[in-house]
A protein has these predicted regions:
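Short, surface-exposed alpha-helical segments at coil->helix boundaries
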Residues: 16-20, 198, 249
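Conserved PLP-enzyme active-site core in the AAT-like
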Residues: 26, 36-45, 58, 65-68, ...
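Extreme N-terminal starter segment of soluble prokaryotic enzymes
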Residues: 1-4
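Generic structural signal for residues in well-ordered beta-strands
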Residues: 33-34, 213, 259, 525
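Generic beta-strand/beta-sheet core signal
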Residues: 216, 241, 262, 303-304, ...
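Beta-sandwich/jelly-roll carbohydrate-recognition scaffolds of carbohydrate-active enzymes
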Residues: 7-10, 199-201
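Conserved N-terminal alpha-helix of the aminotransferase class I/II PLP-enzyme fold
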Residues: 174-222
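Non-catalytic terminal extensions of PLP-dependent enzymes
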Residues: 9, 13-30, 37-57, 64, ...
Length: 715
């Protein structure tokens, strides 16, 4: 970080010559000097060059207005104002909070001023670095010799082997040197929450508006289990979102709890809706407790916020209404909601404490902020027994954490602190909205078909758009007003084939075909439904990537309309079965899969499959214990009616459990089986379109088997 920008428009010798001297002095201190053309060019430079560590400008020309604009982007960035002896320094005490240093134009003062700028730059870096990351950088620079773990010793061991050297060269020396042992006492301990690790947790809690925050190094799958193990002791009852992540199913397999499921909605597109407000009411919960064997009043509730498709709840309503001691918002996909006013009242840590309740929010820092994979956080608002909570934390945390993951978690928080973080999130929101509008524009200008966007008719206001009962764009029935909101950065594109009310069109392009084309062109889709594709506009998405996606979508339309051969348009798919796809063209492939979906009446089937839950014969914990005792057998998928499932069955998409361990598909819930059979049939007819179904195993003959409990194990 060594770039200094000079707005050099002084225009007279007595100003320009001191700046030339300063330029040379700064270069001797290894600074890189850049000259923006004007004020707007400077602001663009600050926006696009994060390594800029200072701005030099003429006070008479630019004054406080420029300083305030820069502060809105980065309030910590050092500013150096040059003035002559007669300049008026009309600066208030409030203005002095800006990071401004004043210098006078003078010949022969360049060395002293350059040294002052170097000192201020060092202070700037020290200010923006969070505590653990700062301590880790310091330790690596010191280059101590260690006789402890890890065995590669800062990368030395890798360089003693040809293949190890290739590995070392790829990742680089700092990655190796920062992979250190918990024996390094000056960095404290992740498990003991001591030293710089404790400071990092306190820092993160302040940034995320939490009472207490924990860094988790094995993803939000683990964070969810930590919260659940503490909040729901054996023998208790919990309320849990039926559209929960599979990690929460694993929690219920590990902990002997009785689940009562919240039942979310779903529209014709297969987009997961929210849990209706009625599900949170005391009377509804009391009825479910009465209907559920061995259930008691729930002690804990788990809600997925946002949903996989970007729908956020009015969390204030849930916190106030839900009559349980603790509420866990699984917010893996929205770690950014604390940093824009449009998310106020729509996230777990929003607002203050709730009397008599503990609010948890788990977030996948790595998913949509800037952190290494597996980086996750737990935020807590309310009173917990920290010693007991830490037992659950240690139960799921390695004693050899990777400090790179930990430091990246803290750095992600540091990036979101203050105005710089707000600017990052606002940039994502603006790019997503521009992309949405561009898709709409291209749709109106295209000949024939083009993609559409799942969103309100008018998106002129930057906000989370409400789903209202008097609107039809969302496709949900009986929606509660002021309850669910669409996050603008979660962009769902619609392909032809289905109307929002579930009516199937004669012409259709299943989204899986588009996803395969995009993958051929280096673009990975987050989630694919029957006729929809989800794209996430995270802070890492820039204009270039957004334009690349637009280009790929228009290229797909052009290739599709030309009706190219599959082997030319989708070569990876062609390689799955060259004989089958040899003479097939893209329109034939799309229309045949579309007809198969129409044949099964997908909208109605999907609705019925998720409307009636399978019967819970035993808890997921009890079913898993029987599996551990070997009391299971495999049967064909077609034969699972009337049998107790041993494992969860979870098709991708949408990636939520369809059948839980311990549940039985009955005649009433047969649509669940029919939905799974339809997914399998598409894969059987068209190689390369097999659906990934967790808990169902494809055999050599192409049929699927599932694991069920043996008949005698029902006793």
């Amino acid at each position: 970080m060594n770039v200094i920008a000079i707005l050099n428009h002084m225009g007279v010798y007595f100003k320009e010559e001191p700046i030339r001297e300063l330029h040379r002095a700064l270069e001797r201190l290894n600074f890189q000097i850049v000259y923006p053309n004007d004020r707007d060019d400077l602001l663009k430079m600050i926006e696009n060059n994060a390594r800029l560590c200072g701005v030099i400008f003429d006070w008479d020309k630019y004054n406080l207005e420029l300083c305030e604009e820069i502060s809105k982007m980065n309030e910590n960035l050092p500013l150096y104002a040059f003035a002559n002896t007669y300049s008026t320094l009309d600066v208030s005490l409030n203005d002095l909070r800006l990071q401004i240093s004043f210098f006078e134009y003078a010949l022969g003062a360049a060395e002293d001023i350059a040294n002052k700028i170097k000192q201020t730059t060092d202070e700037y870096i020290n200010t923006i670095l969070p505590p653990l990351t700062k301590a880790l950088f310091k330790y690596v620079r010191e280059g101590k010799y260690t006789f402890c773990t890890p065995g590669h010793m800062g990368g030395t061991a890798f360089q003693k082997s040809p293949v190890g050297s290739l590995f070392y060269d790829f990742f680089g020396p700092n990655t190796m040197k920062s992979d250190i042992s918990i024996s390094v006492s000056e960095l404290g301990s992740l498990l003991d929450h001591s030293g710089p690790h404790k400071e990092a947790e306190q820092y993160i809690a302040r940034v995320f508006n939490a009472d207490r925050s924990y860094m988790v190094t094995n993803g939000t799958s683990t964070a969810n289990k930590i919260v659940g193990m503490y909040s729901a002791p054996a023998g208790s009852t919990i309320l849990i979102d039926r559209n929960c992540h599979k990690s929460l199913t694993h929690l219920m397999m590990m902990s002997d709890v009785t689940p009562i499921y919240f039942r979310p909605t779903r529209n014709a597109y297969g987009i997961l809706g929210g849990i209706p407000q009625s599900e949170f009411q005391h009377a509804t919960i009391a009825k479910r407790v009465k209907e559920t064997p061995n259930a008691t009043w729930p002690v804990h509730a788990v809600i997925t916020n946002s949903t996989y498709d970007g729908l956020l709840y009015n969390t204030d309503f849930i916190k106030k209404t839900l009559d349980v001691k603790s509420i866990h918002f699984d917010s893996a996909w929205v770690p950014y909601t604390n940093f824009s006013p449009i998310y106020e009242g729509k996230c777990g840590m929003s607002g203050g404490r709730v009397e008599g309740k503990v609010i948890y929010e788990t977030q996948s820092t790595h998913k949509l902020l800037a952190a290494f994979s597996q980086a996750s956080m737990i935020h807590v608002k309310g009173d917990v027994n920290e010693e007991t909570f830490n037992e659950a934390y240690m139960m799921h945390t390695t004693t050899s954490p990777h400090y790179g993951i930990v430091a990246s978690t803290e750095t992600a928080a540091a990036m979101m602190k203050g105005n710089a973080g707000k600017r990052l999130i606002n940039g994502s929101i603006e790019r997503a909205i521009k992309f949405r509008k561009e898709i709409k524009r291209l749709r109106t200008e295209s000949d024939g078909w083009f993609f559409d966007v799942w969103q309100p008719d008018h998106i002129d206001t930057t906000e989370c758009w409400p789903l209202r009962s008097d609107s039809t764009w969302h496709g949900f029935k009986n929606i509660d007003n002021e309850h669910m909101y669409l996050d603008p950065i979660k962009v769902t594109l619609l392909t032809p084939g289905m109307e929002k009310d579930g009516t199937m069109s004669d012409f259709g392009i299943p989204a899986s075909i588009v996803a395969k084309y995009l993958d051929e062109h280096g673009i990975v889709v987050e989630k694919t439904g029957p006729y929809n594709l989800l794209f996430l506009f995270s802070i890492g998405i820039d204009k270039t990537k957004a334009l690349s996606l637009l280009r790929a979508l228009t290229d797909f339309k052009r290739a599709f309309d030309l009706n190219l051969r599959v082997k030319n348009m989708l070569p990876s798919l062609y390689r799955e079965d060259p004989e089958f796809y040899e003479n097939m063209r893209i329109q034939e492939l799309a229309q045949n899969i579309h007809k198969l979906i129409v044949h099964h009446n997908l909208p109605d089937l999907m609705y019925r499959a998720f409307e009636v839950l399978p019967t819970m014969v035993m808890t997921p914990y009890a079913a898993f214990q029987k599996e551990l005792h070997g009391m299971t057998e495999e049967v064909y998928l077609d034969e699972m009616v009337g049998r107790i499932n041993a494992n969860m069955i979870l098709p991708y998409p949408p990636g939520v459990p369809l059948v839980m361990p311990g549940e039985m598909i009955t005649e009433e819930s047969r649509p669940v089986l029919e939905f799974l059979q339809m997914l399998c049939e598409i894969g059987a007819h068209y190689p390369g379109f097999e659906t990934d179904i967790h808990g169902a195993y494809r055999q050599a003959d192409g049929r699927y088997t599932v694991k069920v409990l043996k008949e005698e194990s029902k006793k």
